[in-house]
Amino acid sequence: DEFVRVLNANHKTAVEPLEVAKNESFKQQIVETPVVYIAPYEAKQITLTKQSIKGEKYNPEIAPIHSLYNEYFGGGMNAIVFQEMREARGLAYSANARLSSPLKLSDSYIFRATIATQNDKMMDALSAFDSIINDMPVSENAFNIAKEALITRLRTQRVTGSRVIYNYLNAKELGLDYDINKIIFEQIDSLTLEDVVGFQQEWVKDRVYKICIVGDEDDLDMRSVKNYGNIERVSLNQLFGY
């Protein structure tokens, strides 16, 4: 009530405000058939993104294990993706992967993985990426680092200023009347590496993907790319309108 009083006193509006135009929301598409989109870009390296949407709606009960999986698998330089794709195998300049939460109840979870690599390493990188996504390497040391990093971030982060109202609005879009980070923090310490593996098996393994490649088709192994889905070429005109 105090917030509303202060807002009304200081935020002046027209006597008859204009009607807000209805926003056309982007409708997510369930990925049922594998497709490879390629956009032309003449360079000796490519950027490749895999995206999968199965239609799973928001579930606050999985938030703790979901957050820990993301931290363990694709959260940073100590995560499995970076260590395997860049440090151990030298197959990517950069690599990341995560299962993203919906922003509103009508949306779905999205698994998205991205790599940047040399043209001649693309197929090796894609094969290796598929391997670790579906058969996730298990490391107790990496798990402990991920758990500690997540706990530390939750313990030290602060919601201040305008972020207070935005966090409230974001939670409201998901039907929440509480801070989900509090639940994550309270439960994270009891989760195990076996829990992360179980989550990966249920939520990530063997998904169907749409793959987007930005690169020079003439310098890529397109015959092998076809194994990942029907190829659809996207022109610069389609992307930018000219």
PLM-predicted stretches and their roles:
Residues 1-57, 213-242:
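An aromatic/glycine/proline-enriched structural segment found at the starts
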